[in-house]
Swiss-Prot record:
Swiss-Prot/TrEMBL keywords: Cell cycle, Cell division, GTP-binding, Magnesium, Metal-binding, Nucleotide-binding, Septation
Cofactor(s) demanded: Mg(2+)
General function of this protein: Necessary for normal cell division and for the maintenance of normal septation.
NCBIfam families per record: GTPase_YsxC (TIGR03598)
Keyword Magnesium: yes
Protein name: Probable GTP-binding protein EngB
GO process annotations (BP): division septum assembly
Transmembrane segments: none
Entry annotated with the keyword Nuclease: no
Domain EngB-type G: 30-204
Organism whose genome encodes this protein: Pseudomonas syringae pv. tomato (strain ATCC BAA-871 / DC3000)
């Protein structure tokens, strides 16, 4: 299937910009930024790599490898940000606390941050970390879109049932401000829907000529 979303070309030319250990090392706070967050082993790096058609984000058999804010440029004004993964038991507590402080500082200060993509493993959705991110997004009036990753690990019927269940739980606890979809990196499931969300947040219009 040929995807025609206007964000597709930009994602395909994404390039690594820099890694930041703290907010004052981030790029200039201007333009459009979309951040990707998720508990360790939720498939965040794989999702980013699939969306950009590249191996930009580091994947590892050891969850929790992303320890920095990693910025990827789409053009002069637009960026994707890979946030630190959380929850892996082998990461020392002091390092976890360090990540948490700098994540909170980033989320609370970036004027250019236009939306947050939250990855949830469809087999283990709505973890404590996910609930914290949902609470923060609603309190901060930050648009959030959830990818239920690894949807290929379930049958389509089971995946759809989980989607509806999580959707209902989110609507009950947080209202209609959060959108959600199924996603699979290896099967390339849900790409068009995710691209549409990114294009909207980054204020891209479909410039395809009328037929």
């Amino acid at each position: 299937m040929q995807l025609k979303n206007p964000i597709l070309g930009l994602c395909q030319q994404a390039t690594f910009m820099l890694s930041a250990a703290k907010v004052d090392q981030c790029p200039d706070d201007e333009g459009f930024e979309v951040a990707f967050a998720g508990r360790s082993n939720a498939g965040k790096s794989s999702a980013l790599n699939t969306l950009t058609h590249a191996s930009l984000a580091r994947t590892s058999k050891t969850p929790g490898r992303t320890q920095l804010l990693n910025f990827f440029g789409l053009d002069e004004d637009r960026r994707l940000v890979d946030l630190p993964g959380y929850g892996y038991a082998k990461v020392p507590i002091p390092l976890k606390l360090h990540w948490q402080r700098h994540l909170e500082a980033y989320l609370g200060s970036r004027e250019s941050l236009k939306g947050l993509i939250l990855m949830m493993d469809i087999r283990h959705p709505m973890t404590d970390f996910d609930l914290l991110m949902l609470d923060w997004a609603i309190a901060s009036h930050m648009p959030m879109h959830i990818l239920l990753t690894k949807a290929d690990k379930l049958t389509y019927g089971a995946a759809k049932n989980t989607l509806l269940k999580v959707q209902a739980e989110i609507r009950k606890g947080w209202g209609d401000a959060v959108s959600i979809q199924l996603f699979s990196a290896p099967k390339r499931m849900g790409l068009e829907e995710a691209y549409t969300v990114l294009a909207g947040w980054m204020e891209l219009e479909d410039k395809a000529p009328a037929e």
